[in-house]
Amino acid sequence: MRCSISLVLGLLALEVALARNLQEHVFNSVQSMCSDDSFSEDTECINCQTNEECAQNDMCCPSSCGRSCKTPVNIEVQKAGRCPWNPIQMIAAGPCPKDNPCSIDSDCSGTMKCCKNGCIMSCMDPEPKSPTVISFQ
């Protein structure tokens, strides 16, 4: 019995620590990375050690001549949470507009996600993930 209580308390403490850690971080919906062609021979060798040494939005990336400033590649990162489920929003209330306000999460500000809303995509506040319930018997 003591072992079960200790296990439950340990899991609860871990869940609280992880939840706190997630709240402290702000995730960007677009992540910049060095491109795969960083090692190509035709790269200009402007040596650097950190991103701060590079002009504008360039990054200090590995290259054929050590490390040099390169234009990064932006990769879409999906924002936390999920789009809210509302069956009424899945049905268009009238004629559909031609343009969507968004097409990917990074088109939306803050923590909002790009979700289906009738016949268009629009920025909406996400639903938090449902907590996982663990039962011990």
UniProtKB/Swiss-Prot annotation:
Lineage, top-rank taxon, reads: Eukaryota
Which compartments does it reside in? Secreted
Q: Which Pfam families did the record assign?
A: WAP
Q: Which UniProt keywords apply?
A: Disulfide bond, Milk protein, Protease inhibitor, Repeat, Secreted, Signal
Q: Which GO terms describe its biological process?
A: antibacterial humoral response; innate immune response
Q: In which tissues is it expressed?
A: Milk-specific; major protein component of milk whey.
The protein's matches in Gene3D superfamilies, at most eight in alphabetical order, are given as: Elafin-like (4.10.75.10)
Q: Does the keyword Calcium apply?
A: no
Gene Ontology cellular component list: extracellular space
Primary location recorded for the protein, binned into one broad class: secreted
Q: Which GO terms fall under molecular function for this chain's record? A: peptidase inhibitor activity; serine-type endopeptidase inhibitor activity
Domain WAP stretches: 27-73, 76-127
Q: List the disulfide bonds.
A: 34-61, 45-65, 48-60, 54-69, 83-115, 96-119, 102-114, 108-123
Q: Where is the signal peptide?
A: 1-19
PTM note says: Contains 8 disulfide bonds.
Name the InterPro entries for this protein.
Answer: Elafin-like_sf, WAP_dom, WAP_four-disulfide_core
Role summary:
Could be a protease inhibitor.
Record-linked PANTHER family: WHEY ACDIC PROTEIN WAP (PTHR19441), WHEY ACIDIC PROTEIN (PTHR19441:SF96)
Name this protein carries in UniProt:
Whey acidic protein
Biological source species: Rattus norvegicus
Gene giving rise to this polypeptide? Wap
